[in-house]
């Protein structure tokens, strides 16, 4: 259960009022819990999001759930569905492609800049080790967390604060997308960590061209894999409907 603190009362215009905001940390924890449920498939694509059920499951009031769902809607993970309220937004091939194109451009610049300050990559090896350990354990969510931390460290090592800040809002979407990549099988997962290691070696060698090329290839392969899985799901659904 997530613990919820009672918001303090404040005065406005001489009158005591209950503050509207709940603890930001609680809202973020509710967000994280919902995203994790989406990533793990417990909240399926297109499934309804019922606030009372989520609040009851997490042991919080509806207020932080409402705020969390609003944030997730703004991030594109949740959407309004006519007559159904809020649902888990389906993954669309074009949206996946757009995200990977944006990420490819940003990370290509990040690794080029990081080649000038490889000493800033203090935790990269630790994230590689954690990712490989999670792979051995079959822990997809832990692999995703290590993947995000690894790529975030590359962005931070660039020394460009705008790069890291621009990428941060998109990580919840990529958690979901990465789950699709990692569910493709152990071979795909192992390849991801081998590619991470090669990118890191290129950055530490100061080889900006190779680091950029490897990064773009790494992301392009992941995008192609996810798009292929989504296209296959669409085709399967169409075939089922045709037979119905």
Residue ranges: model-predicted function:
Residues 92-93, 179-182:
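Short alpha-helical transmembrane interface motifs in multi-pass membrane proteins
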Residues 99, 119-180, 193-202, 210-221:
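Conserved amphipathic alpha-helical segments that form helical-bundle/coiled-coil interaction surfaces
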């Amino acid at each position: 259960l997530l613990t919820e603190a009672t918001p303090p009362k404040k005065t406005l215009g001489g009158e005591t009022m209950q503050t509207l905001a709940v603890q930001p940390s609680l809202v973020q924890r509710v967000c994280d819990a919902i995203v994790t449920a989406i990533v793990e498939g417990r909240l399926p694509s297109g499934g309804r999001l019922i606030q009372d059920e989520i609040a009851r499951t997490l042991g919080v009031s509806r207020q932080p759930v409402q705020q969390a769902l609003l944030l997730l809607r703004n991030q594109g993970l949740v959407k309004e569905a006519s007559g159904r309220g809020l649902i888990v937004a389906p993954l669309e091939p074009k949206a996946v492609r757009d995200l990977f194109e944006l990420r490819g451009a940003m990370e290509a610049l990040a690794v080029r800049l990081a080649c000038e300050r490889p000493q800033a990559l203090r935790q990269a090896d630790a994230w590689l080790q954690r990712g490989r350990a999670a792979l051995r354990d079959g822990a997809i969510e832990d692999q995703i967390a290590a993947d995000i931390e690894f790529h975030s460290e590359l962005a931070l090592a660039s020394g460009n604060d705008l790069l890291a800040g621009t990428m941060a809002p998109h990580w919840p979407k990529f958690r979901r997308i990465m789950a699709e990549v990692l569910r493709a099988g152990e071979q795909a997962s192992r390849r991801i960590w081998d590619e991470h290691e090669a990118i890191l070696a290129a950055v530490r060698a100061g080889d900006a061209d190779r680091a950029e090329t490897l990064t773009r290839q790494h992301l392009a392969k992941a995008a192609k894999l996810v798009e292929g899985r989504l296209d296959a799901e669409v085709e399967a659904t169409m075939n089922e409907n045709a037979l119905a």
